[in-house]
Amino acid sequence: MAIHCFLCYTFDTMKFTFKQFIVPNFGKRLAFMLPAVILMGVFVSILVEIGWGTDPASFMNLNVASVLGLGLGNTQVIVYGIMFIFTFIFGAQMIGFGTLANMLLIGYVVDLCRWIWNNIGFSQVLSEGNFALRIVIFAFTLIFFSIVAAIYMNAQMGVAPYDAIPNILSGWITVIPFAVIRICFDLAAVGIGVLAGKLNPDGIQGSIVGSILMSLLLGPVISLVGKPLKRIL
């Protein structure tokens, strides 16, 4: 019976159609979503250079990229590509333009920005500059990252492959609150990043503590910012 229910759930949710890419107020939502995705990449690049922690997904991808010897952009396409297949099978209705934008753009934006920061000397300021200045930059970057992440999510043009998986798991495991599943999933991503970092001669990339704190705090902040945005979008 359990297997039968699982299969029913699987085939019920695997309803993909290209029409789902064209959402109401498409132009308006796209105008919010696409710049938000690009800015997420910009802010993640700053967080990476400061080295005090990023969002759990970026922490995982950054350390996997370091082990594989690839850029973050290529690694994110590979990792999210695997997650995309899982999402397509078990939650195809969550796929949209935002899914593809998140999967294909953010990592390459991070790589480009880090190259720019390195060439103009901003990278040195972020990693070795005045401590108080770095705290201010980190705080503002975290706030603005949360805002643009909220804009991206509330545009409702598709769910990122990373974000789709806890949604799918929540549909399977209804006895556990979604917030708990999401936090556990984020912590698992941090764990994968740590394991990958242990395999890297250069060690773990980024702060474990910072990434764990962000996994606990980002959700509530994004929810808070998202409430007024829903009136606009």
Predicted segment positions?
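Core subunits and conserved enzymes of cellular information-processing
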Residues: 9-11, 15-233
